[in-house]
């Protein structure tokens, strides 16, 4: 059985943990043996670099819920830093209290857009010491598809699903893309 909770989503949450336990939520979980490859947390928006490293070393996963985080204004998890540190990344919809749709297709699209916007916010012009243009390379369509499929299977411990290959279990969804809302679609894998 996998362990799951919501963690490090808002500044108020961090302040409350620091006040009550004199540590961050991730540090609290580490102290109570609640990290590991059988644990995954929703959100993980507010993390220190050493927490990202700890989550990676322990193989603790994340369910990124971009629409919920956007609706609540809590921020956007740095999925690329998490993934580079070894954190298994997946996508989630959070719950009805903060996501009206629970639609994984629009969640994947939001993850793609918001990861790019997050990195773009860090871009500076060259005269100010900037070294990159923006966030266009922050998340690819392939990243988002991986997070929404293989990443989800990994954090749930579903070794026989998550990819389309011989011998694996799979469910397929087919969408019509001839609706006017798809006319500007550049990549069918990331359509809203």
Residues covered by each model-derived region:
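His/Asp/Glu-enriched, well-ordered alpha-helical/loop segment
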Residues: 31-38, 80-176
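Short, charged, surface-exposed secondary-structure boundary motifs
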Residues: 71-76, 100-102, 185
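Short, acidic/turn-prone active-site loops that include or flank metal/cofactor-
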Residues: 9, 66-70, 94-97
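Histidine/acidic residue-rich metal-binding segments in metalloenzymes
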Residues: 1-61, 70-89
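Short, glycine/acidic-enriched loop or turn micro-motifs at the edges of active sites
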Residues: 9, 46, 97, 174, ...
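Short, function-defining helix-loop hinge/capping sites that tune catalysis or transport
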Residues: 14-17, 51, 102, 115, ...
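Glycine-rich nucleotide phosphate-binding loop and flanking beta-alpha elements
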Residues: 48, 70, 97, 112, ...
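C-terminal cap of metal-dependent C-N hydrolases
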Residues: 169-192
